[in-house]
Amino acid sequence: ATLAPTVLIFPPSPAELATGTATIVCVANKYFPDGTVTWQVDGKPLTTGIETSKTPQNSDDCTYNLSSTLTLKSDEYNSHDEYTCQVAQGSGSPVVQSFSRKNC
């Protein structure tokens, strides 16, 4: 059975932005089978500055968890608006979470 993840995305804090760095974190919890994370900025795929770590399967329910971190310079972060994290499992629809900088 496929279990879709709960996906959350966290924008960088103003305190961090003030240091010149922006870290955006995407967390996906309790999903099966294993999946992949992709990031988009203003609708375009992004492949650099990403670090993803997965936890091993949970022995109780065989699900996975992951967290993916996108790190940018503050200037670059401020020059874009929409940040999107997608978690895809096989052929199903990916679970998508995004935020718009204008709304934060």
Curated annotation (Swiss-Prot):
<dbReference type="InterPro" id="IPR013783">
    <property type="entry name" value="Ig-like_fold"/>
</dbReference>
<dbReference type="Pfam" id="PF07654">
    <property type="entry name" value="C1-set"/>
</dbReference>
<dbReference type="InterPro" id="IPR007110">
    <property type="entry name" value="Ig-like_dom"/>
</dbReference>
<feature type="domain" description="Ig-like">
    <location>
        <begin position="5"/>
        <end position="100"/>
    </location>
</feature>
<keyword id="KW-0393">Immunoglobulin domain</keyword>
<dbReference type="InterPro" id="IPR050380">
    <property type="entry name" value="Immune_Resp_Modulators"/>
</dbReference>
<keyword id="KW-1015">Disulfide bond</keyword>
<dbReference type="InterPro" id="IPR036179">
    <property type="entry name" value="Ig-like_dom_sf"/>
</dbReference>
<protein>
    <recommendedName>
        <fullName>Ig kappa chain b5 variant C region</fullName>
    </recommendedName>
</protein>
<dbReference type="InterPro" id="IPR003597">
    <property type="entry name" value="Ig_C1-set"/>
</dbReference>
<feature type="disulfide bond">
    <location>
        <begin position="26"/>
        <end position="85"/>
    </location>
</feature>
